[in-house]
């Protein structure tokens, strides 16, 4: 990967997708994105596949619940059908990050899935929220303990905004995690836990140039958990900012 690669997490436009999946994805492509990160695709895989094909979009990564899934095979098959390369679990609840034993259990589960995922051409990853950084185990952020316990085949997608909300220096975190970090969620805002306060990249308190410089080879994935303005305008502004910081 090169640092110039930019994608968008489709959770950002979930309301538009719920109303008109083909139309929403076409609008994302019209903004200038060529890559997307699907979410909620397993039971709509053919609709997503057709929309991606019609708009010349690729999906190098996607989100799906893996750790708690009873049967991962349909998830793997759906991801492979969309050409996904890295399949990322978007969240393990906060209560599962308070002890080393719980963290080990999550790491073990992802390691268990890495082999079967590889049979589908997939790499397994994990995406953080704030609690993996805010909660400490053995005097260190839980996410860093987790990284030490991960199988070498498992990668990280660091949500840079939620990491900052969790109280860490994101550039320093990325430096410590190193090549394990293959993807970044890029977002901006006042660095609070209110999703509706999020802003387009470059308009908030995040030092995004320093963040990008700390992981120059990671795929940049634009995301809004929520946005008070027009979400498509927010995505366009973020993409323009990132193109200016290639």
Residue ranges of predicted features:
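Active-site acidic/histidine proton-transfer and metal-coordination neighborhood
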Residues: 35, 67-155, 160-163, 176, ...
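Short acidic, glycine/proline-enriched helix-loop-strand junctions
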Residues: 46-64, 106, 122
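Short active-site-proximal "capping" loops at secondary-structure junctions
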Residues: 41-45, 59, 65-69, 227
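Residue-level recognition of beta-strand->loop/alpha-helix junctions
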Residues: 12, 39-40, 63, 128
């Amino acid at each position: 990967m090169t640092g110039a690669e930019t994608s968008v997490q489709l959770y950002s436009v979930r309301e538009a997708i719920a109303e008109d999946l083909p139309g929403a994805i076409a609008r994302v492509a019209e903004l200038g994105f060529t890559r997307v990160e699907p979410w909620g695709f397993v039971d709509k895989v053919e609709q997503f596949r057709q929309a991606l094909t019609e708009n010349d979009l690729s999906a190098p990564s996607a989100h799906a619940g893996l750790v708690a899934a009873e049967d991962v095979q349909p998830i793997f098959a759906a991801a492979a059908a969309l050409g996904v390369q890295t399949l990322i679990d978007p969240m393990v609840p906060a209560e599962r990050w308070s002890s080393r034993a719980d963290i080990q259990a999550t790491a073990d589960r992802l390691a268990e899935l890495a082999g079967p995922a590889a049979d589908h051409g997939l790499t397994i990853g994990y995406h953080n929220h704030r609690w993996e950084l805010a909660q400490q185990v053995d005097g260190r952020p839980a996410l860093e303990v987790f990284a030490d316990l991960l199988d070498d085949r498992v990668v990280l997608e660091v949500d840079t905004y939620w990491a900052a909300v969790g109280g860490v220096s994101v550039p320093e975190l990325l430096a410590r995690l190193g090549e394990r970090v293959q993807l970044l969620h890029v977002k901006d805002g006042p660095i609070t836990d209110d999703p509706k306060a999020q802003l387009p990249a470059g308009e908030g308190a995040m030092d995004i140039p320093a963040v990008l410089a700390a992981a120059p080879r990671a795929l940049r994935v634009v995301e809004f958990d929520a946005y008070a303005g027009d979400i498509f305008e927010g995505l366009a502004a973020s993409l323009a900012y990132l193109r200016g910081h290639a």
